[in-house]
Amino acid sequence: GLIVLNEMGLDPGIDHMSAMRILDRIRANGGTMEAFESYCGGLVAPESDDNLWGYKFSWNPRNVILAGAGSSAKYIDGGITKYIPYHKLFQRTVQVSVPGFDAFDGYANRDSLKYRSHYGIDGIPTLKRGTLRKGGFSIAWDTFVQLGCTDDSFIMELGADATWSDYLNAFLPPS
């Protein structure tokens, strides 16, 4: 026989397969769900964490930069639907502890509610999917968002000899 598999990256992909496996096990053991929160992220192995961001591009760099842009994050918390617009996304983070590691920044990942029926948890009062990044990432990234550095609605014409300083200065107000 021939097995055909499509690309099964992290998000969406492995995160959903892991979620379904856990939910199926809970149901098989007679359990019920009162809340569902799931975080994932392309985290750097400690021995390879050699930059201040604690991040390495493991997928399309443009998509990394635009992650979260385009629509508000949406989830439900205690029966109340929450919305986070992109310009606030990296300001509304939670700390997620993982044993053996420093705390991670967790932020809401797009529309969590569309997974309620897929996961079979339509009546659940809390459902949130999120992304993990190294602690401090969100504060730094939010600076770029607030400056407008992640806006792809225009083309910058700085020239081939432009420096990173020239790039950032282009977003700052006149002095």
Indicate where each model-derived feature is located.
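C-terminal catalytic/substrate-binding lobe primarily of soluble NAD(P)-dependent oxidoreductases
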Residues: 29-175
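A contiguous active-site-proximal alpha/beta segment in oxidoreductase catalytic domains
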Residues: 1-44
